[in-house]
UniProtKB/Swiss-Prot annotation:
InterPro entries: Acyl_CoA_acyltransferase, Leu/Phe-tRNA_Trfase, Leu/Phe-tRNA_Trfase_C, Leu/Phe-tRNA_Trfase_N. Keywords: Acyltransferase, Cytoplasm, Transferase. Its EC number is 2.3.2.6. GO terms for cellular component: cytoplasm. It catalyses: N-terminal L-lysyl-[protein] + L-leucyl-tRNA(Leu) = N-terminal L-leucyl-L-lysyl-[protein] + tRNA(Leu) + H(+); N-terminal L-arginyl-[protein] + L-leucyl-tRNA(Leu) = N-terminal L-leucyl-L-arginyl-[protein] + tRNA(Leu) + H(+); L-phenylalanyl-tRNA(Phe) + an N-terminal L-alpha-aminoacyl-[protein] = an N-terminal L-phenylalanyl-L-alpha-aminoacyl-[protein] + tRNA(Phe). Its main location: cytoplasm. Functions in the N-end rule pathway of protein degradation where it conjugates Leu, Phe and, less efficiently, Met from aminoacyl-tRNAs to the N-termini of proteins containing an N-terminal arginine or lysine. Gene3D superfamilies: Leucyl/phenylalanyl-tRNA-protein transferase, C-terminal domain (3.40.630.70), Leucyl/phenylalanyl-tRNA-protein transferase, N-terminal domain (3.30.70.3550). This is Leucyl/phenylalanyl-tRNA--protein transferase. It is found in: Cytoplasm. One of its GO terms (biological process) is protein catabolic process.
C-alpha cells in the first residue's frame, strides 16, 4: 500500500516506495508550488496521466548526471563549435513544455498535460523552474526544462526539432551548472540517450544524501542568464 496525500499530509519516507512499480511512493495531494518544492527537496517527483490521481515517485536506483562527467561525442563537439545556433534561457518556458508534450513516435501519449504545464509555469514565475533553449534561424529547435533547488537541477523533459538540438541545450546547461557550483542533474530514470552523455545510476540512498547537501547551498533563484560559451564559438 502507498500513502494517500491530503492537503496537509507530508510525504512518507523514501524507503516506503514500492519496488514494483519502481519508486511509487504516494498518491494524491496537489501540484501547488509548496508541494512541488517540498517534493523535489526530498528527491520526489510527480508523474501521472491526465485525468488520473497524482502519483509521486522516487525510484531506486536514480539516474543522475554529474556535470563534470558530461560526455561529448566527436560529432556533437563539431556541432557545438558552429555558429548556426543560439542558446537562450527562460525566454520560452511554456513553449518548451508544450513542445516536450507533443506526441512522439515511440510514445502512445504524454504525461505533460495542461495541469502540469500550469503548475511548472507557476514555479518558473517564482524563479524555481527553468528552460534552456536551442534556437536556429529564429526558431525554437530544441531544449529542456526542469526545477532548480539549492545547487541541484531536476531535469524533467527535453525535445528536438533539429538534429542534436536537445543535446546542445544539455551541454550548455551542464557546463553552466558546473561553473555555478551545482552538484548534479537529476535524470530520474535510465535512458540510453542520457547514458551516452555520461549519466549513470546511483543508489537512492546515495542520491538522497547528496541532495540534502546540495539543498543547503544557495542556488540561482532568479531568471537565468548563461555566461558560458562553448570553446570555438563566437558570442551570439
Amino acid at each position: 500500500m502507498i500513502r494517500t496525500l491530503y492537503s496537509d499530509t507530508p510525504f512518507p519516507p523514501l524507503e516506503q516506495a514500492l519496488i514494483e512499480p519502481n519508486g511509487l511512493l504516494a498518491a494524491g495531494g496537489d501540484l501547488s508550488p509548496e508541494r512541488l518544492i517540498s517534493a523535489y527537496r526530498q528527491g520526489i517527483f510527480p508523474w501521472f496521466n491526465p485525468g488520473e490521481i497524482i502519483l509521486w515517485w522516487s525510484p531506486d536506483p536514480r539516474m543522475v548526471l554529474f556535470p563534470r562527467e558530461l560526455k561529448i561525442s566527436r560529432s556533437l563537439h563539431k556541432t557545438l563549435k558552429k555558429n548556426d545556433y543560439q542558446i537562450r534561457t527562460d525566454s520560452a518556458f511554456t513553449e518548451v513544455m508544450q513542445a516536450c508534450a507533443a506526441p512522439r513516435e515511440d510514445q502512445a501519449g504524454t504525461w505533460i498535460h495542461e495541469e502540469m504545464i500550469a503548475a511548472y509555469t507557476a514555479l518558473h514565475q517564482m524563479g524555481v523552474a527553468h528552460s534552456v533553449e536551442t534556437w536556429i534561424e529564429g526558431e525554437l529547435a530544441g531544449g529542456l526544462y526542469g526545477v532548480a533547488i539549492g545547487r541541484a537541477f531536476f531535469g524533467e523533459s527535453m525535445f528536438s526539432r533539429a538534429t542534436d538540438a536537445s543535446k546542445i541545450a544539455l551541454v550548455h546547461l551542464a557546463r553552466q551548472l558546473e561553473n555555478w557550483g551545482y552538484g548534479l542533474i537529476d535524470c530520474q530514470m535510465k535512458t540510453a540517450h542520457l547514458m551516452s552523455m555520461g549519466a549513470r545510476e546511483i543508489p537512492r540512498s546515495q542520491f538522497s544524501k547528496r541532495l540534502n547537501q546540495l539543498n543547503a547551498l544557495p542556488g540561482q533563484n532568479r531568471k537565468w542568464y548563461f555566461d558560458f560559451t562553448y570553446p570555438g564559438r563566437s558570442e551570439q
